[in-house]
Amino acid sequence: MKELICAFAVVATITSALAQGDVVYDNSSDPVLGTFVPEDTSLEFGDQISLSGDASIVTEFRLEYFSSDAAGTGVIRFRANDGAVDLQGGFETGQLEPSTVLYESASFPLQADFNTLEITGLSVPVPSDMFTFTIEFSDVPNTQNVGLLLRNPPVVGSSFDGVWVRPDNGDWALRQIPLTTANLAAQVVAVPEPGTVALALIGIGSLFGFMRRRR
């Protein structure tokens, strides 16, 4: 009986820990290196990141931005990097452009000053532990300063040192930011795939079964 109670306690603890998720990407540490937004603030742009660890179902996402005024809106998207090979000056860079939309948020109002946008309750599978998160601003007045914060380096995971920007023609392009590293401030929390959790629980069950037989 004691062994059964112990087994349930271990399973409950592990299941609870897995449900809470792990920080698989974190670029939220000081210093702040500035902000970035394309000259045309209506263009979609974002950062390509790689997640750390085995958890690949995104459950939480945080993004830092600045806005001088409480006006305009934004939309967050997660895109798989499964598009065409990026070209610069007619030569292939070897990087695949963002394409397939994995997630799109509802439109949210921009708030004045420095802000952290927090999105929770997600369940977004990420292919190959890598994706590009983007933002698209709308209805931003010409007099308004708005942009995403730049930080470096990420303390968990890694980020491609460039920003993807989608011009009006729809062809994505990589842009570098002079005198700084183009890593947008963000944090990602994820949980393992259900199959991984199931295998872990099966392994625990087998271990307790073996221990009972030994007794």
What are these regions (language model features)?
Residues S67-F160:
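Aromatic- and Gly/Pro-enriched, solvent-exposed loop/edge beta-strand patches characteristic
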Residues P31-L43, F108-A112:
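Extracellular beta-rich ligand/substrate-recognition surface
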Residues L18-P38:
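Boundary/junction segments of secreted and surface-exposed precursor proteins
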Residues E39-S52, L117:
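Short beta-strands within extracellular/lumenal beta-sheet-rich domains
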Residues S56-S68:
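A short beta-strand element within beta-rich, extracytoplasmic domains
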Residues F208-R215:
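C-terminal membrane-anchoring or membrane-association module
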Residues K2-D22, L184-L201:
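Short, threonine-centered small-residue motifs that mark membrane-proximal processing/anchoring sites
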Residues G21, N152-V191:
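PGST-rich, cysteine-poor low-complexity/disordered linker and tail segments that act as flexible spacers
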